[in-house]
Structures are given as C-alpha cells and as structure tokens.
Amino acid sequence: DELGPERNQASMKLGQEYTTEAYDKIKQTAPDIRVKNISGNAYLYSSEAKTLRDVNAGNGYLSLTVELFGSYDSVQAFAQDCRSVTDAVQQCSAQPDELRITWSPENDPGQSLASGSLQNVEQYTLELEGIAQLDWTADQMAKQTEVQYLLDEENEETAESEAFSEESSELSE
C-alpha cells in the first residue's frame, strides 16, 4: 500500500513509543549511564503494523540511536557502557534491527591541543546490525567501535569517510 498519512503517523507514533520505552529501560537497568540523546525510528512496510511487536514480526524496520554523555578514556570503557545499554534495549517489547551508540567529547579538541593536553580527541560510534550482534560481548563491541580523531577542522570532514586512518590525523603545517 501507498505510504499514506496513516502509515506515516503510525511510524512516528511507534518511533516515539520505542524511544520512550528504550529510555525508560536504560534508566531502570543502567542508571549510571548518562544518555545525552536517544531517538527511535520505526519504518513500516505496511499499515498493518500497529504495535512494536508487529514491526518486529516482519512488518517494518526499527532503529535506535543512543548518544552518550560523560568522559571515556578508552574504547573499552565505552564498549562496557554499550553492553549495558544493549542489555536494557533487549528488554524492550521489540528488538532494534539497528542499534547505534555514539559518544563525542564535550570539550573543544582545538582547545585541548592549544593547552597541550590531548585528552578527548576521539569520538566513538558503535553500530550493531541485526539481533545476533545485540548479544555480543563488550570485547566484540570494542572491536566493532569506529574511532574518529578530532584533531583539527580539516580532519572533521575526512572523519566521515570509512577510509579515514590514524596516519592522516597527524597535524600538517
């Protein structure tokens, strides 16, 4: 059927419902984790899908993005929290087809360069696809985490590309 206003509204409603449910589960099961932002999206294949369970039954695609807050000094520390977030999300009434967990430092990397202290010039992104990856250990999640280096403005654009490598993050005159 057409992507009519009815299906659109249902998608939005289920996306919001999913966001709220996931956030509540994270607060209950992992109260130490600081969530900066969370957004769930439901893409419905047909207007048959009325509940989150319907979406999981093959009537749509669910994705969830969780942005974390705080300071991580390693990918391992980030991955531990990703595991806790994933545990919480797995208790929701529906499972995400895609779970994306991200973290960026609060400080301005340029300032930490100027002050000579180089903490927090990395940002982390973990993308889990499909239900099998939701069962991964924190170690597997750490390996899957993409690390981007935020050393200067020029690098922020190249950080978008998959091919971004550590060597290109050296400062050029």
What positions do the PLM features span?
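Soluble non-cytosolic domains of exported or imported proteins
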Residues: M12-T20, Y72-Q80
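Short, non-transmembrane amphipathic alpha-helical segments
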Residues: D73-P96
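Solvent-exposed, polar/charged alpha-helical surfaces in well-ordered, non-transmembrane soluble domains
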Residues: T20, D24, Q28, Q80-R83, ...
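Polar/charged, Gly/Pro-rich intrinsically disordered segments
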Residues: E21-Y23, K27-F69, A94-E173
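Short amphipathic alpha-helical surface micro-motifs
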Residues: Q16, S46-S47, D81-S84
